[in-house]
Every structure is written in C-alpha cells, then in structure tokens.
Amino acid sequence: MKEYNVLQYGAVGDGATNDAFAIQHAIDDCAKNGGGRVVLQSGYVFYSDSIRLRSNVDLHIQKGARLKATGNIDGYIRPNKLINDPKTALIGNPVTGKPSFVFLYGYEADGCTISGEGTIDANGHAFVQRKDQYYVTGDFYPRPTVIYVEKSNHITFKDITIVDPAPGRVRRCAY
C-alpha cells in the first residue's frame, strides 16, 4: 500500500498552524493515484479545518498523533449548503437529517478508512458558551458533527480514539 505523509505536503503539526490544505492535498493525491494510506505521524498535533474523505484512502493517525479540529466554524464542510432555505441549511439535523457542519466528511467515498491508534480531537468545547463540571450550555447549532459519511460502501473505522466530540453518524451506507 502506497503511503502519503502529510508532512511532505507542507503540514506543520505544531497544533497551531492550520494543516487542512496539506492533509487534503495528500488525500486527494492518494485517491487520484488509486488509493493508499495518508499518514499523520506520531508526535505531531495536526490542527485542521474540515477534511473530505475519499474512496480507497486510509486516513491513518499513528499512535501519539492528534488530529485536532479548529474552532473556526467557517472552515467546516456544510452538507446542507445547496438547500435554498438558509434557516434549514443552518439548522440541518431536524429538517434534512444531515448535520449543518462536519469535521471529517465522506460522500460517495467507497472503501474509505480512518485508522491508527492516534486521536481525533473534535474540539467540541470551542463551540459552547459555558461549561463546568456538571453540564455544557450554549446553542445546539452550529456545533459540528465529528464524522459524517453518506452514500458510501465498505467504510472502516479502526482503533481510533475520538475526544471532545459533538455528534457523529453514518447514514445511507452499506456495511
């Protein structure tokens, strides 16, 4: 299996620089060349806006690596964007069954995989108004969904850890 290291695509992995472009470029190259593994290397924190998953690509987060979502909602993929009603496009879930904003998004991404013993940090607390040891308050929307995959077959999630998430789901996919 051919590997694509995101550091070779310009990712910094310092936990502050937005590495979305480098990660997405590696994923797109991998998919364009028939698939393989995109590696997020151990010892780095890759801070990122939304990432689009592709067919036959394994997004592999090594043990000791962290993929951390930015707190910038404007950098998130919006599955409802083409809906003509702006209120429905923002609210999403109760009306369309789709989330309004997504961190890791797969659409017609057959054979996509997220693997490795690393961590996906959804940075959910960046989207709330107040938190304490007992509860979190704030608007339900527009908290982003961590992973949303639709119209895809043979998807795999293996050995990953997800921390500080908002909701996530798999919809209309064959297993």
Task: Provide a role label for each language-model segment.
Residues 1-175:
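Extracellular/periplasmic carbohydrate-active domains that bind, remodel
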